[in-house]
Regions:
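Catalytic core of membrane glycerolipid acyltransferases/transacylases, capturing the structured
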Residues: 1-27, 81-86, 102
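Membrane-interfacial terminal anchoring regions of lipid-handling membrane enzymes
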Residues: 29-46, 56-66, 70, 74-335
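Short glycine-rich anion-binding loops that position phosphate/pyrophosphate groups of nucleotides
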Residues: 51-54
C-alpha cells in the first residue's frame, strides 16, 4: 500500500527491490496499468499478496481476493488485442511461506506474559502458559467491553463475547464513515471495506475553499482515529478465532502472545531465532480459464482464485506438521 512507501528508508528499499505502490480503496489506474503491462510483456514476474490484508495467523490463509486472476485476464485482453495468434500461457506460481521456531521459546514468552500481567493488574499468574494467556485475553476483552459500552450476557461464552465485540466495533466504524456492512461478508471483508473507506476520507483531495479545507481536516482527524478500532478488530480476530487449544503449538502460542502484547503494550516483538520455509508450487496456467472468463467473468475469477488458494492451503497444511506441539516439549523445569 502507498503508506508503506512514506518512511524514507523503507520507501527507498521497497523501490529498489522493484516494488510499486497501490492506493487502497480506490481504482488506482496507474498501478493497474503498470501491472497489466508487466504481465503482458512477460519479462518480469509480479509478486502479489493475494489475501489483501494481514490476518496474523501462521497456519491458515485468509480469503483470497480475485486480483491475481483479474490482472492475468487483463493482460490476456491486451495480448489478444495485439495479436490474432494463440494466446501465450500466463502462469501464477503459488508461493507458501511458513515460519517455524526451532528452539524452546517458552521462557521468553513467559517473561512477556508477566509484563502484560503487570499492566493489567493480574496478580495470580498461572504456571501453564496457555492458561495465563487465556487470563490475559479475558482481561483485555472485559476492558474493551467497558470502553465500547457493551454488556455481555450473564454466563456468556468467551468466543461469543469476542464476536459481539468485533461486531460492535465494526458497526461503530461503519456508522462514522457511512458504510453499510453486508451480512454475507466475513469479518476480514468488513475490515478491508472499512479500511478502504477511512483511506478515501483521510486521503481525499483538498476542498476548494479555506473554510471547507478546515472542516475537511477536522473530519479527517476524527476519522483517522478509527484506524485504531479496525486494527483492534484484526488483533482480536488473529488472537481468538478458529484455533483448537488441544493442538496448540509453540508457534501458535507465540502468535497469540504477539497479538495480545500488541494490544496491551502497543508494540510487537518476535522471539527467535525463526526458520522460514518457502515453497514455490507448480505454476497454474491462468490462460486455461480465459475462454470461461470471456463467457462469465465472475465464474472464471472464482474458479481461478479458488484453485490458487487451494494450492497454497494444501501446502501450508502439510508444513503445519513441522510445527512444535507444546505437548512434545520437555516440561518447564524438568531435566
Amino acid at each position: 500500500a502507498l503508506e508503506n512507501f512514506f518512511p524514507p528508508l523503507q520507501g527507498w528499499l521497497l523501490r529498489n527491490v522493484g516494488a510499486y505502490s497501490v492506493v487502497r480503496g480506490t481504482m488506482d489506474l496507474p498501478c493497474f496499468r503498470c501491472t497489466r503491462r508487466l504481465l503482458a510483456a512477460g519479462e518480469h514476474p509480479v509478486v502479489i499478496f493475494p489475501e489483501g490484508e494481514i490476518v496474523g495467523q501462521n497456519d491458515v490463509i485468509g480469503a483470497f481476493q480475485p486480483g491475481v486472476a483479474q490482472f492475468a485476464f487483463w493482460a490476456l485482453d491486451e495480448l489478444r488485442a495485439a495479436s490474432q495468434g494463440p494466446l501465450p500461457p500466463v502462469y501464477a506460481a503459488p508461493v507458501t511461506m511458513k515460519y517455524l521456531l526451532p528452539g524452546d521459546v517458552r521462557p521468553a514468552l513467559a517473561r512477556r506474559m508477566a509484563l502484560m500481567e503487570r499492566k493489567l493488574n493480574l496478580t495470580d499468574p498461572r504456571t501453564d502458559l496457555y492458561d495465563r494467556l487465556g487470563k490475559i485475553g479475558e482481561a483485555v476483552l472485559a476492558i474493551a467491553e467497558r470502553e465500547y459500552g457493551l454488556t455481555p450476557a450473564p454466563g456468556g461464552l468467551f468466543n461469543d463475547r469476542v464476536q459481539a465485540a468485533k461486531a460492535a466495533i465494526l458497526a461503530r466504524v461503519a456508522r462514522e464513515v457511512n458504510v453499510t456492512l453486508r451480512p454475507d461478508r466475513t469479518t476480514i471483508d468488513h475490515v478491508r471495506m472499512l479500511f478502504n473507506a477511512v483511506d478515501r476520507i483521510t486521503r481525499a483531495a483538498p476542498a476548494p475553499t479555506a473554510y471547507a479545507r478546515k472542516l475537511q481536516r477536522e473530519h479527517q482527524r476524527r476519522v483517522s482515529a478509527l484506524y485504531v478500532d479496525l486494527w483492534r478488530v484484526l488483533r482480536f480476530a488473529a488472537a481468538f478465532d478458529g484455533y483448537n487449544p488441544d493442538r496448540l503449538t509453540q508457534e501458535r502460542l507465540m502468535e497469540l502472545t504477539n497479538r495480545l502484547e500488541w494490544e496491551v503494550l502497543g508494540s510487537l516483538r518476535w522471539v527467535g531465532p525463526m526458520t522460514a520455509v518457502v515453497h514455490v508450487g507448480e505454476p497454474i496456467n491462468l490462460t486455461a480459464y480465459y475462454d470461461e472468463y470471456r463467457r462469465d467473468r465472475q465464474a472464471a475469477l472464482a474458479m481461478a482464485t479458488h484453485r490458487l488458494a487451494a494450492a497454497i492451503q494444501e501446502k501450508l497444511t502439510e508444513l503445519n506438521a513441522r510445527m512444535t506441539p507444546l505437548a512434545a516439549l520437555t516440561p518447564a523445569g524438568a531435566p
